[in-house]
Amino acid sequence: MVSLLSVLAMAQGKKSFTLDDLLPGGSTYHQLQPQNLYTAWWGNRLVETDLDGSNEINPKNGSKKVLFTLSQLNQWLGAGEDSSVVRSCYNVEFPDGRQPWVATVVSGKGKNGGKPTSIYTVVDFKSGKKVWGQEYPADATALDRSPSSNSLAFVRQHNLYVTTKEGQTMAVSSDGSNDLVYGETVHRNEFGITKGTFWSPDGKQLAFYRMDQSMVPDYPQVDITTRIATTYPCKYPMAGEKMHKVTVGVFTPATGRTVWLQAGDPTDRYFTNISWSPDNRKIYMIELNRDQNRAELVRYDAATGKKEGVIYEEEHPKYVEPMHGLLFLPWDSSKFIYQSQRDGYNHLYLFDLSKPQAPQRHKTFQGGACEEHVEVTPLTSGEWVVKEVLGFDLKEKSLLFCSNEIHPLQSNIYKVRVKDGQRTLLDNGEGVHYGSVNADGTYVEDRYSSPTVARSISLTDTRNGKGRNLLTAEDPWKDYNVPEITCGSIKAADGTTDLYYRMVKPVDFDPNKKYPTVIYVYGGSHAHNVEASRNYLARGWEIYMAQKGYLLFILDNRGSEHRGLAFENVTFRHLGVEEMKDQMEGVRFLKSLPYVDADRMGVHGWSFGGFMTTNLMLTYPDVFKAGVAGGPVVDWQYYEVMYGERYMDRPQDNPEGYKGSNLRLKAGNLKGKLQVIIGYNDPVCVPQHSLSFLRACIDAGTQPDFFTYPGDEHNMMGKDRVHLHERITQYFEDYLK
């Protein structure tokens, strides 16, 4: 009894969280995050880029040597005279591993009172002298700098420009508009696309996307900040409708000439994963049909744009989703690494261009097939996923990568020897590790966390796996009353597949009480909610709700990432069906627990999770008492072509699948309290989803609640994010507790 009272007294003496403490955008959020170390590679050397200076870190003993201070950097830049003051060293760069150079961006005053500019400035921190500066418009976007030539590509008002190191600016295009876009991301950032320009290794040529979207309808977004509200266009190709047409150009600054890759008619095709050959002469591109069930790796002559041939083909009865460009071996330009899920899990394959062959066709996973036009050797294999490639060890001729080979919830750092596929683990084999590698691959910076480790950063020698700890952060929540967070597994609705969950129990949990329970759900592809990192990846809002007496349950259903192709594509052509079956297995598990109040179950999610929340409320109206659906998809025919058709096919080809996932048709099933929340200017799940659902509910005589954030897009940021979670919390307080 004395011991129990002591524990209760300790708990009562600890602090309680506010939403500002727990949410990005909260006024005290950063004060309660684990201590961090901000770093950058300077060639082979690791540098701490701190608030007030930069320090080189000794890999042998972890000691630090000052390279320069913030005040010195501002002095060298002439801050306050020709440019703005740099307020921290967090974002400085070291553009040349062979030179003592530091680079940063400062604001310029513009020439002759012209428009404001930005200046990319390089300083020699040994001599304190400026090496060079590169000025460009302050409103430029899509910045892409070549580390070889130091030329800069950028986009302004949908046109593409190149500025050389010497300051000469050239317009690559002049007819850019909302209908015709140059140098920007295409295909709505699907297929791993993160940018629209691609420098050759020597920096003397620039490949770029040109996207004609004149045939794509404008979705009307509303700007309420004008005296009388106005609309502005948002190009949005919906499933089954016309999509944009993409072509690829190659610009040579020395001649001012552009050639176009002769890829043929771009109608209903996707071009992605653009890669250059090491000799700057060839361009490789992966091309997909609109059905996304066939991909070809194609080679082009960069000088003429001529198509030289297909290197590799891959097809699958559901879909193929290439996400990564080619990685040529630094020691052998005839070989490259290719990533593919052709055998059921994302793995690495070694392609040898020096060994062309008559096309070799092989059967692959789930009735798929591939055709190899050069020799291909699997480099990794197994029922696990390569999550990220980090770089190469040049001396040992190995590749470094992260995978979940040890456990589906983990991420660990390995190196694999290219000549024979021998793998070596480079970390402690626990938790979640992410890394970055120096120039020659001799060291990896290992950033690690686990359910009990807030953050640990080490510098590891890749030759022997020995690491030097640089930081082990204390738990920033040690003075707070933190709920118990556990992790476990249940079986999926198929009866065989393991699904992993996180449970956050109420603060001061009493197993003899019954608690209101909220299921937080996402459930879609390219995301997961549970992993073996700090607090099993628990979100701040879950901690806040546990503090208010709720039990939180989070389950990664089939359809989510990092579990292999079969785990993901089981949802094909009927999104929401298998996902809900798995979530209901979670409900069945919860109902078996004596401390879960089955009469007070709620559900909340955002985006795909908003779709899942609404679907669960309407499909199982007697199970869920309250729900909050954020930015939901309501009808997949209103969603974008690329994502929607990959998982659902076109509405014309899959009418039953689209009908089954159309939540408007279930509007009459609503019994519990459902609040729908959207950003009024959402360009991802456009407002038509939620507004059409409200109309369907009116027609059906049901009563959902609705709230919108004018001016916000798909996600609320800053103080709006705190406001959002205050509203979500209050809804459950009003209707679930």
Predicted regions and their residues:
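Beta-propeller folds
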Residues: V2, A11-T424, E430-Y434, T442-Y443, ...
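Generic alpha-helix initiation/capping and coil-helix boundary signal
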Residues: V2-L4, S146, D494, P683
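Serine-hydrolase catalytic core recognition
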Residues: P217-D218, N280, I286, Y434-K737
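Structural signature of Gram-negative outer-membrane beta-barrels, strongest in the C-terminal barrel
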Residues: D427-N428, G549
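N-terminal signal peptide c-region/cleavage motif recognized by signal peptidases
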Residues: S6-L8
